[in-house]
Structure formats: structure tokens, C-alpha cells
């Protein structure tokens, strides 16, 4: 269907406001590039590792680690989140420590904090690839470069691979891509369930916002300029659901609210506050700072099921309709085309409580539609974890990528499982790869 001229103008206007056109966002006014300088390594890294930190010309802090027995491969890492606060010089150390097993196995590692906090997949992808160039310029081009994204960083790395895999001269900037616990449904499909959560939570709790507070559409997260701490949000959830107390201590109203919220949305009790925080502070960032106040979320056609009274829920829940221009702007920034050109492996826990494993089904479909399924391998575990899976599995996925690049043969899940066993002596953690699992496509 032809796009209406007015809609197209609105898309371009939103992109301009969001800073999503061209090179991304403006460089922080106070940013000054800092070349890599020696820095103390985290204690989790092997003895003899050389660590450096610096800042890109666009203001992105970064850390780099080279082990003494470097194997010639560099891992360029894209972190998750997104973090909504101002990036700090040592932010990358958190993921350097989390993935220290990679450095321990002989891989060099580089991670960026990105130039600013908040949402922006293209911005983060640009900063990630800029870090690759910084490392190449200062430490020399490695034998191989692997792009790795974790959680939201999986969206970032997948976008970076689509945008920057091939240099203008036709050479390749990366040899392979590894995406772990990745948010691979993209921007327009990756946050729908959190918009649903805000609506369902408010139906049962009526305290975010409270009746005494200014009303605002729930899709905004918060009004422009407002703030809410995690402690405040947690207190509201506790007040309504008795989340932290024993089931026996909850009032009937609290038990009913918690039961229905979890049943309808599918989130776990342990992650309820975290998901609501994303649907509060991150939504505020997306809507007001990236989309100029426009709404990218919709639940107008959603039928909610699983409650004690679905009829009452669907009649009383707040409804909202997305602005097509906002959806298009978010899609431009964060959706994926599936047009991959590099060997790509994903690793995801079946029961991931933060990023549903259904993201993998969506990504597989996206890649298949682009005709690139031969470049994608997906591996799943039986874990119910997100931020960090079992150590041998990360080492196995890296070894599987090496074998793929060496032989040209895409590894199967069984191949990765067999490799995993060979790394059991690296830690006390198990191999939990499920070789027969394939996720279902989530239509919502």
C-alpha cells in the first residue's frame, strides 16, 4: 500500500528528533577522545592479562583486555540494557568480568559503554564498530574478529553486523557473530509484552499512577521530565501484590492481583519489578527522548487471557493505539532485516525470564525470509537464566564458531553439545544444551 506523504514526513521528523539519522546522536559536548591507557584488570582475568581503557571521539568509554597467551582472535562485545543513566568510564568492566572465561580461554576482549545512556540501537551499533576500529588501529588487526552481543546487546550486535560487516573496500570487518540471550525480535516487537504488563498491572493495582497522581497514557512510561526510583516502583508493587512476603502472609487482594498479573503476562515473580522498571523508565526514554512524544506501542487488538475474569479484564484494561510514524522510526533504528553475510551463532536459555526464547524463532524467521538461513545456527539450553549462562557453553559456542570458520561447515546443536563437554574442566558449571529444542513463534 502506498505510504501517505504526511506519514513519511512524520517519520522523518521523528528520526530527526531522535537523532537516528546519519551518524546517530550528537557527541557529548564534554567528550574528548582518550587513547587506550593501561588499566588494572578485574581479578577474574588470568594473570598476565593486559587491560586498557579509553574514550572514543564520540564520547564512548571502552575497555580492552589482551591475555598473555592470546590466540589471535578479538571479541568485540555489545552490552545489554540499555542503561538509562550517564555512562561511566568503568561501566564495561561489568561485562568484562561476566565474560572473563573468554579471556581465560585466550581471546582478546573489547567492550564499549556507548556514547550515551538510553535507547538507540544504531547509535550503539556505531559505537561498537568504532571500538573495533580503535582496537585495530592501536593494537593491530587480529587474525580474526568476532562480534558478540548479550541481551539487548544482541539486538545491537545483529544490527552492527547488518550495517558494518563489510567495509567500503569489500573486505570484512568481522569473521563471525555470536548472539547470547539476544533481544532479536527488534524494537517494534521486543517490548510489546512490557506494554501489556503496564496495562494489566494498572488494571489490578491502580497505583502506577495512583488516583491522586496526574494521569498519563501508560505507554509513555512516565510523563516527560518525571522520575521514579526503583525503590518507589518496588514499594508500589509490594503494596499491591505482597511480592516479597510469603504467600500465607498476603492479603486475599494481594494474592489475587499477583496471581492474575503473572498468569496473564507470563512474567515471573522474580522479574516482575525489573520488567515494570523497563516499562517505566525505558519507555519514558524511548517515547520522550527518542520518538518526540509519539507512541510506538499498541494493545488495541489484544485479547488478554489467563485471569480470574478475562471479560472484566478486557473490558477495563487501558487501551492504546500506536502512531505509525513512531513505529516506523523505531523499526528503522532497531528492527532487523535478517540480511546477514557472516556465520552467526546464537545461544539462548529455553526459560529465559528476561528475553523470551521466542525471540529466536522470530529471528530465524527474519533470516529465512532474507534467504540467509544457511548462515545461522541456533543453540538452546535448559536453563532459566538470562544474564549469564553456564561457562562451558560460552566456550563451546566460541569453539564451534572457530570450527565453522576453519572448515566452512555450520555446526549443529549436537556439535556444540559435544564441544561443551570438553570444557567441563574449566569450571564447576554443567553443560545443559538441549539439542532437540526449537522455539515456537510468538504471534504477539
Where are these regions (language model features)?
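Short beta-strand element of the alpha/beta-hydrolase
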Residues: 72-83
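Short beta-strand/loop motif that positions the catalytic acidic residue
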Residues: 340, 345-348, 352
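N-terminal cap/lid segment of alpha/beta-hydrolase-fold proteins
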Residues: 34-71, 312-321
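Gly/Ser-rich "nucleophile elbow"/oxyanion-hole loop immediately N-terminal to the catalytic nucleophile
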Residues: 69-70, 131-151
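Primarily recognizes the serine-hydrolase "nucleophile elbow" in alpha/beta-hydrolase
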Residues: 144-206
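Accessory cap/linker subdomain of secreted extracellular hydrolases
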Residues: 35-42, 183-334
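Secretory targeting and sorting signals
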Residues: 1-33
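Alpha/beta-hydrolase-fold serine-hydrolase catalytic core, especially in secreted/extracellular enzymes
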Residues: 35, 46, 240, 244-280, ...
